[in-house]
Amino acid sequence: MEHKEVVLLLLLFLKSAAPEQSHVVQDCYHGDGQSYRGTYSTTVTGRTCQAWSSMTPHQHNRTTENYPNAGLIMNYCRNPDAVAAPYCYTRDPGVRWEYCNLTQCSDAEGTAVAPPTVTPVPSLEAPSEQAPTEQRPGVQECYHGNGQSYRGTYSTTVTGRTCQAWSSMTPHSHSRTPEYYPNAGLIMNYCRNPDAVAAPYCYTRDPGVRWEYCNLTQCSDAEGTAVAPPTVTPVPSLEAPSEQAPTEQRPGVQECYHGNGQSYRGTYSTTVTGRTCQAWSSMTPHSHSRTPEYYPNAGLIMNYCRNPDAVAAPYCYTRDPGVRWEYCNLTQCSDAEGTAVAPPTVTPVPSLEAPSEQAPTEQRPGVQECYHGNGQSYRGTYSTTVTGRTCQAWSSMTPHSHSRTPEYYPNAGLIMNYCRNPDAVAAPYCYTRDPGVRWEYCNLTQCSDAEGTAVAPPTVTPVPSLEAPSEQAPTEQRPGVQECYHGNGQSYRGTYSTTVTGRTCQAWSSMTPHSHSRTPEYYPNAGLIMNYCRNPDAVAAPYCYTRDPGVRWEYCNLTQCSDAEGTAVAPPTVTPVPSLEAPSEQAPTEQRPGVQECYHGNGQSYRGTYSTTVTGRTCQAWSSMTPHSHSRTPEYYPNAGLIMNYCRNPDAVAAPYCYTRDPGVRWEYCNLTQCSDAEGTAVAPPTVTPVPSLEAPSEQAPTEQRPGVQECYHGNGQSYRGTYSTTVTGRTCQAWSSMTPHSHSRTPEYYPNAGLIMNYCRNPDAVAAPYCYTRDPGVRWEYCNLTQCSDAEGTAVAPPTVTPVPSLEAPSEQAPTEQRPGVQECYHGNGQSYRGTYSTTVTGRTCQAWSSMTPHSHSRTPEYYPNAGLIMNYCRNPDPVAAPYCYTRDPSVRWEYCNLTQCSDAEGTAVAPPTITPIPSLEAPSEQAPTEQRPGVQECYHGNGQSYQGTYFITVTGRTCQAWSSMTPHSHSRTPAYYPNAGLIKNYCRNPDPVAAPWCYTTDPSVRWEYCNLTRCSDAEWTAFVPPNVILAPSLEAFFEQALTEETPGVQDCYYHYGQSYRGTYSTTVTGRTCQAWSSMTPHQHSRTPENYPNAGLTRNYCRNPDAEIRPWCYTMDPSVRWEYCNLTQCLVTESSVLATLTVVPDPSTEASSEEAPTEQSPGVQDCYHGDGQSYRGSFSTTVTGRTCQSWSSMTPHWHQRTTEYYPNGGLTRNYCRNPDAEISPWCYTMDPNVRWEYCNLTQCPVTESSVLATSTAVSEQAPTEQSPTVQDCYHGDGQSYRGSFSTTVTGRTCQSWSSMTPHWHQRTTEYYPNGGLTRNYCRNPDAEIRPWCYTMDPSVRWEYCNLTQCPVMESTLLTTPTVVPVPSTELPSEEAPTENSTGVQDCYRGDGQSYRGTLSTTITGRTCQSWSSMTPHWHRRIPLYYPNAGLTRNYCRNPDAEIRPWCYTMDPSVRWEYCNLTRCPVTESSVLTTPTVAPVPSTEAPSEQAPPEKSPVVQDCYHGDGRSYRGISSTTVTGRTCQSWSSMIPHWHQRTPENYPNAGLTENYCRNPDSGKQPWCYTTDPCVRWEYCNLTQCSETESGVLETPTVVPVPSMEAHSEAAPTEQTPVVRQCYHGNGQSYRGTFSTTVTGRTCQSWSSMTPHRHQRTPENYPNDGLTMNYCRNPDADTGPWCFTMDPSIRWEYCNLTRCSDTEGTVVAPPTVIQVPSLGPPSEQDCMFGNGKGYRGKKATTVTGTPCQEWAAQEPHRHSTFIPGTNKWAGLEKNYCRNPDGDINGPWCYTMNPRKLFDYCDIPLCASSSFDCGKPQVEPKKCPGSIVGGCVAHPHSWPWQVSLRTRFGKHFCGGTLISPEWVLTAAHCLKKSSRPSSYKVILGAHQEVNLESHVQEIEVSRLFLEPTQADIALLKLSRPAVITDKVMPACLPSPDYMVTARTECYITGWGETQGTFGTGLLKEAQLLVIENEVCNHYKYICAEHLARGTDSCQGDSGGPLVCFEKDKYILQGVTSWGLGCARPNKPGVYARVSRFVTWIEGMMRNN
């Protein structure tokens, strides 16, 4: 359907659908529209009109003053000066004015109204303002004559480009505007002919094409005679004449020219070399003077070929910056044509340019391919030199500057880059385009005698050269010079001295630049005079050494003499002196037989001049080493004919070849064919014995014959031995022997029989087809672009037996083994069996190769899906999803379905798709695509369109839909993975949610989503089709993502009453401004959002009236105008449309429309109010909290707009309570500056019939719309329906008002809970708590339940309880309470008690439980905010974090928590089946995080999901270790026992997953490895139908308990990730650009919903890099407010790491600071051990052991063995405060200081070592040496003489924590020093830091703990960093695994003198308990710290770092059984520690 027909149909539809329009608004105009008075204000291109009274952005004189009767109101379309139709100036600065998008009224309308008489004020503007006066006769699709009378609406050029509007200057500035051509009909962008050229044309929207003729045809004769074109007299053009177009008719395209082409007026614009012409009016890229202004009669239009200055032929300047101008590729017309047209007389304006612009004046006699004499008369067009180089244009100075220009040689024919001889040298020549070769002779031959007598060369008198004499060439003829030679040229004695490439010969007697032995002394008879060409050693022809240092020698540019000449002169006898040079100087001896285009045999005898390879590359010269260095030179192969760059075969390979000029391709065979047999028998190839190759064997080429190119292969191609070397994507193959760019093992050494020669396609390891590694670093390998041979060929050759050397590469190198069955263009079923070669998506994108990770990293590779046919980039379905798909080459679109269709039924039954068992996907489920079929295209939808499965993808505004699987340009959660049944295929319109109609996200970044341009199916269709059941994944995206659910009523162009019910799609204001989207905050911030006004229809940017304004309005897109009323009219009020509304007519507000008020009068004074209180006129002035009201007329303390001016009927008297804007009750602003407003303390009057008022349904700022019932003193159900007025909590506290933020800030307001009845401070239950509650007025108690009781449950109450559906809260879940009802008292619990909801609140020792919402006496994080589904109500016993049973914090300050006094319920069948499903917190963001749960079988050898249901008998870990029995405590003590986990199947030692780990695991029987994952795989999807067991997914604990689930190793060091990084649990927190990550639980600077609560299983700890939503790699939000998120600077782990989970290894992470102290010093540098050996002045240091030049005796190595006095290195043996020094080598200066910088600290977090600790369970006594620097906070406390006596812990750069008893020997700080970063106790490493102690602080209550302040801060490195302090009063849970370290007594065990570690368990408080101390050890074994470790650390791992929980204090002996070690409890002293550090 044509565009115009669509427009007409749409207009008809709107006319029939819309109700009768107002008589004010006109949507059509009569005549020329002078009488039009409508309110339309949009132009034909959609631009908004500028107001007539405004001068911005366009100055004009069409104002009401100048045109008082023209109706110039606002920005409405008008016609003040009688042009063709109504128009306006636009708001777009780039477009001055346009006609309006209005149509003429029909005749019936036209006769009814006579346009008024309009007498405009005379125009005060220039005539450029005039517009055309003719009528619009309709649309014409052909034109008469030359089209000047054409007034159609066509706007497309002959090349399909869109026309630019005539009034627009973008992209082309011009003068064909309506102002200058008022009668030319220049409306919009329609094709016109304003200046009488050949046909209608227009300027184009393409910046690169100025104008083109339109794609219109001339009308037929019948049409042509019917209409006489009007007389058009255009206003004289005010533009430069350059705009003038040719005046002749358009007779067709002229492809030839007459004479010299001055009369040519065709449209050709291409030069002889194919370059595009530059426009004559353009100065880019070449500035010139041939412009239309200077040559007005030369027809210089656009970039057409012309001849303005009478040169030889039409020419033009080119678009190529390197070529100024060229002749055009036109031919002269034949004589018949030539006589028919006499060229016009052209008198050009004299040129204003330099004479260099002049072109030659001679005629173009045709192309000559030979020349006469020396070629001075040659005027052909040849432009290639003898070596194949392209000539430089004579007028160009690039790349060679010269003086042979047309200006200096005007008669030499220097046109373009044609070969010429301007200065009478030997033959035509030219400068070359090659910067390395200045000039060469051209590859032309002399004409024969017959030709020579026919043409007498002209007399050429060149202008004297202005160049340096070096440029001069000989001008005389050379009479005595021989220009040819006889035989091989040994007798040649001429004076020629130039080589074939134009180089000058070196003199034979000179050794510069080349040293040689061909001198006159050694060859006295060879005529070696000067630098003349000679042949002293009988090679093929005369040659010489060259003056070019890069080219040693070349043959001379001489030809052999003819036979006639040959008989006249007998060559002399030449006996050369034997050569003294190496044979490399030898040159070939054979004759030059001419040019051959085929070769015999293998081509060794070929002596032709062909120099192009099979791929079209140019050959490198054999004597050149650029770009490839080689040994096939004329010196080494003198008989091989290695002349210039001709194809040769010097070493007997398959065919002639050459090295190429392409640096990326070393060599290739030449594009030559073998000669036929007839030719082959005629010439016997000579015997060639080449000099042995001096190159490495890598240079060798294949030795087999070249039987022709094999372009197909047999079988799988193992026998293929062809020479093809290109992949299916066109990439060049990498040589098999090369390791660049890809290292591999498919080399000739390992596969000797596989034919791995050069880079030819091969199949060494029997994959599907020949392949190769590619030269592209981003693509490792691809199949080759070869096809299988036909059957006939296949039976003829048996592939050879190939036994490759076993592959040395990883299996990832393997390729699929299936055959290629041919090309399929349709697929069966879901396309799993498809094996075709299609590789294009539905949007036309090219597929990414499956084996490539660029641009998208993924796991669908041939390695993981070996049977899925993942060859090259062909469309496949490995998963399976709905249809074949692929990843795309477009970085912004990850994947799309392929543009394939399903095969027909006949085809479908013929092929059964194969059984495909893919390797389980290693990617996130977000990769999955929908599984439904494509049912065909539907162009209408049923109901709300949920069942629509058509293929439409255009929105109502014409935008293209974004693909559902794409996140560009809009990120979203409506993906096929989360809505698998919604049919989200490609970018088709769908309704997954469901909303009102099908919709989609758009590809326009500025418009997020729109409804699709679809209509609802007719009733007949509706009844015929039942939409399918659609089960939607619940949308968890932000509430503003939801669209309206009401039916689309169509387009409304009028509104009823105040427009509150208006749901149309109009979005323009009365001044023509575009509306801002309601959900957008740009450019205006506001609160009228869909979240706050969910029932107001705030969809997109449509006009609405959410708050009872007088009419629909919107915020505008103009930053300077906040809001305006919309350009809508009221609908005619009929009986059916009457609504009961208030009579509210306020004055228009200039601010947000919420400021409006009703107009009713005050009825008197009252103490209660009716309805919502809008009619209240009492004198009450106190709020619900007792605050006094602010006067309405006052702006203090709160500025506002509720004044009598804006609300004259609102009764705003004094400070009385009022309700001016339809709130839920009267209110006022308060006198309290901290509380803006509150509801008043008034009650509703008793509801009687007379008191019922009709109120508006809209609410301004907030509040629900339901009426308040009477007072209730009990509640039904959970109390959500309670609307009573009770406001006291269970403890008697008064409730806080819901609208108040004092004393507690919250979000339970009427905006977020409009249906929650949140009136005043009444008890309510807005969020489905277990009963009504409220915030309290007590600042110390945030909220409590109300003192209400449940109503008796009777039938009547059950039936009358209203249904209240609260709006979901958009606040953080911190406020949420459990939603389940209390089931009564439970005295037992099931499983681990996570489902327990009883009311017991007593521990096993009888202590009372602390309330979960309280922080007294124990601060904690088990609050409803973080555990919303854990039932954390009051102080009831619960198990929020998967402990072994319910527990609670206690009210006893000395006991942090205990298990509750509950027993486990008996395990019966019913109890197992009724175990509730505990689901995690549903994400309030996009549902992309949710994945479908897998089914679980009962017993199997694979596991489903995370393996919690696995009941198999596997008992081996991934590393082959045997599992420990679950009921055993040896070798690992644990709490995962059958008693504690009765439902987890903990039988024997079988692999299980009792606590929601990643997969089944077990404790191992290896004492050094606590646990590992089991060696199991996930079950395939086909097994997913087995019965599912109850799913218990607890929210993970945010606080460590004793048995943290073993879901990962302690994530201290992990700098790489596996797969896409979803499993990454390292601690890296820096992005690729170096930005720091934002904490996942923080909302600053970026608000988000990727929180630990919403993604409990994704490890969102602190600010560590993670991948919670299956992106391509770990990422994080950044701390940079301007950058929301970035990928992290992490790399993927190696393949070996990706296949198994290896035991923890020691990964040394490079320090981010200095690597050691070698390059810098700590403190005063006393410990400096670097190698600096010069002083600050640069003087060398004297060696410390030397006595010269300075004698010394104090500081020598023998007496200062600890000072490191090595060699002459700078040292500080005496602790000089100025730093290291040395004795100098200057005899006058004894010593000087060295310039050594201080070391800088690196940035490391506390408690996170950069080396993974060993965590060995042995004891220090038993000997477990720690990994060096894995406990970097360990301190060695020493005496000032260096003896170690105690340990300590670094807790900040300046502070060390140790035991107080370590400091009893001395109270002086100078007695002590500390050693940091040491691993050895005695032989200290060079990087250790030695720091003095400056102050001591003992704990004041005599606890065994003390603080040391260091004399300077320690430098934080990867070897020295602090441990973390615990939270104050934190209680370590019993059985927590902790670690002690130290160098203490080891009682003779292994590792003495090295830092040791040991693992201990914290002992229960009942066994060993004191509030100042904790106890820890293995009670049954000898593991303890000994005396030497006093003061050392006891650290426990929590979440992601090590916390210092204890300081080693004392114990009974050393590692005695049942005698635990005692440690000072650090958490008890944290307040004291922090105070000391802060105050000192």
Swiss-Prot record:
PTM text: N- and O-glycosylated. The N-glycans are complex biantennary structures present in either a mono- or disialylated state. The O-glycans are mostly (80%) represented by the monosialylated core type I structure, NeuNAcalpha2-3Galbeta1-3GalNAc, with smaller amounts of disialylated and non-sialylated O-glycans also detected.
Xref: InterPro entries: Kringle, Kringle-like, Kringle_CS, Kringle_sf, Peptidase_S1_PA, Peptidase_S1_PA_chymotrypsin, Peptidase_S1A, Serine_protease_kringle
Any single biological process term in GO: lipid metabolic process
Enzyme class (EC, first level): hydrolase
Protein's UniProt keywords contain Phosphoprotein: no
Positions annotated as glycosylated: 61, 101, 215, 329, 443, 557, 671, 785, 899, 1013, 1127, 1241, 1347, 1381, 1461, 1575, 1689
Signal peptide: 1-19
Other comment: Apo(a) is known to be proteolytically cleaved, leading to the formation of the so-called mini-Lp(a). Apo(a) fragments accumulate in atherosclerotic lesions, where they may promote thrombogenesis. O-glycosylation may limit the extent of proteolytic fragmentation. Homology with plasminogen kringles IV and V is thought to underlie the atherogenicity of the protein, because the fragments are competing with plasminogen for fibrin(ogen) binding.
Name of the protein this chain belongs to: Apolipoprotein(a)
Species annotation: Homo sapiens
